[in-house]
Curated annotation (Swiss-Prot):
InterPro entries: Aldolase_TIM (IPR013785), Indole-3-glycerol_P_synth (IPR045186), Indole-3-glycerol_P_synth_dom (IPR013798), Indole-3-GlycerolPSynthase_CS (IPR001468), RibuloseP-bd_barrel (IPR011060). The keyword Acetylation does not apply. GO terms for molecular function: indole-3-glycerol-phosphate synthase activity; phosphoribosylanthranilate isomerase activity. Pathway: Amino-acid biosynthesis; L-tryptophan biosynthesis; L-tryptophan from chorismate: step 4/5. One of its GO terms (biological process) is L-tryptophan biosynthetic process. Keywords: Amino-acid biosynthesis, Aromatic amino acid biosynthesis, Decarboxylase, Lyase, Tryptophan biosynthesis. Disulfide bonds: none annotated. This is Indole-3-glycerol phosphate synthase. The gene is trpC. It comes from Cupriavidus pinatubonensis (strain JMP 134 / LMG 1197) (Cupriavidus necator (strain JMP 134)). Its EC number is 4.1.1.48. Belongs to the TrpC family. The lineage of its organism: Bacteria, Pseudomonadati, Pseudomonadota, Betaproteobacteria, Burkholderiales. It is an enzyme of class 4 (lyase).
């Protein structure tokens, strides 16, 4: 399964091109900007929600709403975004992460709208962002945060995407996999720094990835460990290393009740 990321990015470019033909950027931007102060759509403060949980002594859990993945196939047959989001909210999640990629993760924009609409938690649009158009899409769908993957973006475009998100009131989670990507991530303004324990080019997973990068992390960054958190021992290992923010999907999606599994994992 070599270089999955390149395949995904090629499809993303085609998706954006097709979306622009259906709706022009000025129209989409106007809608996104108009929602900033509208009841129910105003940004909910993704970073703030994480920090509040951690300040209260809890883990800051970004709980994922994900039907499938390229490496594991369908994770949850009984996939009801509203029920999943409600369960997460009632069992201690700080935020949601909702997959909107259709072709590789069987996600959808409607899943983001439905999950966010069913609970008070802020939501991340989990997708492969390659164009400003997608940032405006994210806000028009209600997203409170976007994901920027260093491996997928050149530094100039990444900075532009971040600036656009911040102008719209959204937070930004920047994601790295290795030390070679850290410098680019640290040039951004966002304090939210995700470390993906899964290599997006091979889909191999190692929790050592987060631990190995910790010594290089500035103190003002909030480190989010992503992927491979499957049991309480994984959580303990990270929290013992002073990592208190987690993005977890598969372990929750495979459980009978995702929120109950969240509470068990982070008890």
């Amino acid at each position: 399964m070599s270089d999955i990321l390149d395949k995904i990015l090629a499809v993303k470019a085609d998706e954006v091109s097709a979306a622009r033909k259906k709706r022009d950027l000025p129209s989409l931007r106007a809608e996104a900007e108009s929602l900033r102060n509208e009841a129910g759509f105003a940004p909910r403060g993704f970073e703030r929600s994480l920090r509040d949980k951690i300040a209260a002594g809890h883990a800051g859990v970004i709980a994922e709403v994900k039907k499938a993945s390229p490496s594991k196939g369908v994770l949850r047959e009984n996939f009801v975004p509203e029920a999943i989001a409600e369960s997460y909210a009632s069992h201690g999640a700080a935020c949601l992460s909702v997959l909107t990629d259709v072709n590789f993760f069987q996600g959808h924009a409607d899943y983001l709208k439905r999950a966010r609409g069913a609970c008070p938690l802020p939501a991340l649009r989990k997708d492969f962002m390659v164009d400003l158009y997608q940032v405006y899409e994210a806000r028009s769908w209600g997203a409170d945060c976007i994901l920027l993957i260093v491996a997928a973006l050149d530094p100039g475009l990444m900075a532009d995407l971040e600036a656009c998100a911040h102008e719209l009131g959204m937070d930004v989670l920047v994601e790295v996999h290795g030390a070679d990507e850290l410098d680019s991530a640290l040039r951004l303004k966002t304090p939210l720094l995700g470390v993906n324990n899964r290599n997006l080019r091979t889909f191999e997973v190692s929790l050592d990835n987060t631990l190995d990068l910790l010594p290089s992390m500035p103190a003002d960054r909030l480190v989010v460990t992503e992927s491979g958190i499957l049991g309480p021992n994984d959580v303990k290992r990270m929290r013992d290393a002073d990592v208190h923010a987690f993005l977890v999907g598969e372990a929750f999606m495979r459980a009978k009740d995702p929120g109950v599994e969240l509470a068990r994992l982070f008890a």
